[in-house]
Amino acid sequence: MKNVGFIVTKSEIGGAQTWVNEISNLIKEECNIFLITSEEGWLTHKDVFAGVFVIPGIKKYFDFLTLFKLRKILKENNISTLIASSANAGVYARLVRLLVDFKCIYVSHGWSCLYNGGRLKSIFCIVEKYLSLLTDVIWCVSKSDEKKAIENIGIKEPKIITVSNSVPQMPRCNNKQLQYKVLFVGRLTHPKRPELLANVISKKPQYSLHIVGGGERLESLKKQFSECENIHFLGEVNNFYNYHEYDLFSLISDSEGLPMSGLEAHTAAIPLLLSDVGGCFELIEGNGLLVENTEDDIGYKLDKIFDDYENYREQAIRASGKFVIENYASAYKSIILG
């Protein structure tokens, strides 16, 4: 069997890590899978991997010693395909191709060179453009990411394959009594904006907000909303599947590819309220609304969904099978194993 490696900067719960875990489980019967990351965490404890390698230097923008450690792992384990799923990991995965031969796949989960670049955005985009020359496949998870790759970064179209993210079927929401429970699931770091949603709901006592996720902003957010009885922080939850216990899923963020938590909520058949960024629009088909990242628009759209809730829930039920992973399995395997 082939030996396939996944390299991701961090191993804590997040969209890229969830993606690595789901894809690994999908292909595990057809190849040996290895994980390379910078730290122990949620992902390294999964039993799907034949080997797990921790290289702390992957967190750094560039380090020669890290590059040679990666080369050694690839050669000693005869890894023929390496899939990078985060920005820093993507830099090392492409540069190590100068030292060893393998099939290199880079997965964009929102193009951090655009949303994290700041004043250096143009430089990071140039770097990403030239790194693409060392990449066999640029895997875009949404049409929005594909468009940005071509128009904003300048990546050549033949390098790009666009296949949507997808997730296992979540437990579906049945006809339960409406409780006006709103759910946010995401890592509490940039570019997520849970504070906008919390500010809105703190002023609307008819709703309750339940925030699932850890991250560097968790404690400061808990302190900020400590006196709000309808704002609840559940912290980091391993293997969260309980979307069906809530009435609405909302993800407010400054940037997304095609968010894994949004996909999970979609398959659970609950209405969605999502920021109009990245590929989020691909999840909305009458089953929810897109918002600008302002409190006024979030509040207005939140009320609009609950005022016509049965219609949005009916559309959510109809759409819930679209992003189930079994529908995309052959396409994923073709990219990785083909």
Swiss-Prot record:
Tell me yes or no: is Transmembrane among this UniProt entry's keywords. no
Q: Which Gene3D superfamilies match?
A: Glycogen Phosphorylase B
Extract the InterPro entries matched here: Glyco_trans_1, Glyco_trans_4-like_N
Per UniProt, the keywords (alphabetical) are: Glycosyltransferase, Lipopolysaccharide biosynthesis, Transferase
SUPFAM superfamilies, A to Z? UDP-Glycosyltransferase/glycogen phosphorylase (SSF53756)
Task: Look up the record and name the pathway of this protein.
Answer: Bacterial outer membrane biogenesis; LPS O-antigen biosynthesis
Say which enzyme class the record assigns. Answer: transferase
Could you give a GO molecular-function term held by this entry? glycosyltransferase activity
Q: Which reaction does it catalyse?
A: N-acetyl-alpha-D-galactosaminyl-di-trans,octa-cis-undecaprenyl diphosphate + UDP-N-acetyl-alpha-D-galactosamine = alpha-D-GalNAc-(1->3)-alpha-D-GalNAc-di-trans,octa-cis-undecaprenyl diphosphate + UDP + H(+)
- Keyword Transcription attributed: no
Query: What Enzyme Commission number does this protein have?
Result: 2.4.1.306
One Pfam family named in its UniProt record: Glyco_transf_4
Q: Which GO terms describe its biological process?
A: O antigen biosynthetic process
The entry sums up its family as follows: Belongs to the glycosyltransferase group 1 family. Glycosyltransferase 4 subfamily.
Purpose: Involved in the assembly of the O-repeating unit during O-antigen biosynthesis.
Q: What else is known?
A: O86:H2 and O86:B7 subtypes share the same O unit, but the O units are polymerized from different terminal sugars in different glycosidic linkages.
Annotated protein name in UniProt: O-antigen biosynthesis glycosyltransferase WbnH
The protein's organism comes out as Escherichia coli
Which gene codes for it? wbnH
